[in-house]
């Protein structure tokens, strides 16, 4: 959707929350919901919800609200979930293994094809049928397989080297769990997940209320 190019990052970051909540409504057989009801459940104002959704089209009907199934479907398309994605995880430590064990990824269309590590005790093992390969084979694996997203779960001093290999092999999406900001070309999208940042935000908010 070309229109997405002009959508603010703030709106984009709210979309997964809409998607997740609508999924829960579907599981509970809820057919429709108003922006006011969404507001009460999701924590955004009704006006904000309407503005966000209007960025992508006219999904609601006055006096009726939103068809939950249709809205969930449309947001899925906006998020790119109408296509499957092949993923690899680089780093088979605690974070990498936790991600490999997260079954919801496959339900969303994210298929973890392989993991990579340097630890000889891990190489050759499988997590949910996902084989852990020697990181020395990362480049050759990428040359032979169609991979969309690379997830980096290695220590910070190795993260940029891994990112360089991914970029060299035309990976356009990187989910980075290493505590370092990566340097990549403009056409490569990086989503950083610095776990300590979230925790420090929490401690700041705790102290703000005291």
Curated annotation (Swiss-Prot):
InterPro entries the UniProt entry points to: CoA-bd (IPR003781), NAD(P)-bd_dom_sf (IPR036291), Rex_DNA-bd_C_dom (IPR009718), Tscrpt_rep_Rex (IPR022876), WH-like_DNA-bd_sf (IPR036388), WH_DNA-bd_sf (IPR036390)
DNA-binding annotation, residue ranges on this chain: 17-56
MF terms (GO), sorted A to Z: DNA binding; DNA-binding transcription factor activity
Classification via PANTHER family: REDOX-SENSING TRANSCRIPTIONAL REPRESSOR REX, REDOX-SENSING TRANSCRIPTIONAL REPRESSOR REX 1
Origin superkingdom: Bacteria
Subcellular location: Cytoplasm
Keywords, alphabetical: Cytoplasm, DNA-binding, NAD, Repressor, Transcription, Transcription regulation
Quaternary structure note: Homodimer.
Residues annotated to bind NAD(+): 91-96
Task of the protein: Modulates transcription in response to changes in cellular NADH/NAD(+) redox state.
A single GO BP: negative regulation of DNA-templated transcription
Similarity annotation: Belongs to the transcriptional regulatory Rex family.
Name of the protein: Redox-sensing transcriptional repressor Rex
One of the record's GO cellular component terms: cytoplasm
């Amino acid at each position: 959707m070309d229109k997405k190019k002009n959508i603010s990052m703030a709106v984009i970051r709210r979309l997964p929350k809409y998607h997740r909540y609508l999924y829960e409504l579907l599981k509970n057989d809820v057919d429709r919901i108003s922006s006011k009801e969404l507001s009460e459940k999701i924590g955004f104002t009704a006006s904000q919800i309407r503005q966000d959704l209007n960025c992508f089209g006219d999904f609601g009907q006055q006096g009726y609200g939103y068809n939950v199934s249709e809205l969930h479907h449309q947001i899925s398309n906006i998020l790119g979930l109408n296509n499957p994605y092949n993923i690899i995880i680089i780093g088979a430590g605690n974070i990498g293994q936790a991600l490999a064990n997260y079954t919801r990824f496959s339900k969303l269309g994210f298929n973890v094809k392989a993991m990579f590590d340097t630890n000889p005790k891990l190489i050759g093992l499988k997590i949910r049928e996902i084989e852990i390969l020697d990181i020395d084979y990362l480049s050759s694996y990428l040359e032979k397989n169609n991979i969309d997203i690379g997830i980096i779960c290695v220590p910070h001093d190795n993260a940029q080297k891994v990112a360089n290999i991914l970029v060299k092999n035309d990976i356009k999406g990187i989910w980075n769990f290493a505590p370092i900001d990566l340097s990549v070309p403009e056409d490569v999208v990086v989503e950083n997940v610095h776990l300590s940042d979230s925790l420090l935000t929490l401690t700041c908010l705790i102290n703000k209320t005291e």
